[in-house]
Amino acid sequence: VLLLSDSAPIGLLPRRLAWDVLQAVAAGAYADVALERVLRERDLKPSDRGLVTELAYGAIRQRRTLDAWLDRLGKVPAEKQPPKLRWLLHVGLYQLLLMERIPDSAAVNTAVELAKTSKGLARLAPVVNGVLRAALRTREAGETLPLPNDLPAQLAQAHSLPDWFTQLLIEWRGAEGAAAVASACNRVPDLDLRVNRLRSSPPQVQKDLAAAGISSEPIVGCPDGLRISGHSGDLRHWPGYAEGHWCVQDCSAQSIAPLLDPQPGDRILDACAAPGGKATHLAELVGDQAEIWAVDRSAGRLKRVAANAARLGLASINALAADAANLLEQRPQWRESFQRILIDAPCSGLGTLARHPDARWRVTPQSIRGLLPQQQALLDGLLPLLAPQGVLVYATCTIHPDENQKQIQALLKRHPSLCLEQESQLWPDQAS
């Protein structure tokens, strides 16, 4: 436990919280969950919330680059550093080498102070000071990290990605395309809102936000979407949030529900539904006049579906905690009863590394292979629930063909009566 005194340097708390997030992620937590927890526990001003987010997500995103600098600047390789020290040095190095508006003294002094006041690290405060000051000298001398000779390793180090992933990118897209995707994986993602047309309209929400000093613009090809620029602060305090005028949803995710072409009166099944972004979108598209079943294995996560539906004023969504792949066994009366089925399948998430920076360090070729049987089980298990002439949409947020095109090709071979109506893939460098 780290206690901060009144005489602690200004800006210590945001850096400490970012350090907490890095340690939690290294211990297996998801970055967005860990970040949300530390922000919820503290009543921070908007600028400090923004700093915590940028430091945590930025240092996680650039873990490989920061480790390479640690290997060069320290006497002990990054992998062999005490974990607490390694992640604290990442927070400091990220500010010095990869951020522009942070004073050098603030980056160094806060890191040294955090070491001094942290149990087990006090004796290593001089190491923190030495490494960060060495980084300053290196930066002032204009020195850069040497790149490996082979292209996959070059791309991986330059963009802080695993070698196996850049190797695949080159196979899929060629050298130039791979570089474009790798660069897109490190882009700071936009914040997109989806306007609830049952309660407001995009122009009205835009006007309400502008009155609170929040600028937004419509998203091309996304009729209900607004993109926020330069945001900070707690979104729950923004105009229209409590009233259910809008929710947060990435523009690419907003494109999924319309593919089902849902109609009022339909029975609609959303498998793997939590936290409810697509289920609520489906309800909005049919004017809340449908029977929608939001199914998820996690009863805890389903509570978020219910909470989001309630805030948006939607009454057509029924939540069910169940394994969607075995739904027919639990509800045999549901056979051929759904006009629309959405399978938002569990996947590697390789298309969303910009939004989920920790995924690049968690996903492995082995973990992807482990997902393939789950995806197949969902497709085969839910197909009998589809009514004649019904529509099934299989959606993922990955770019791996084994999880996408190959799953659908195999499904069509197993079920020749199916007709493929539409197939499309968006790459991270092509996203709007």
PLM ranges: what are they?
Residues 1-432:
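S-adenosylmethionine
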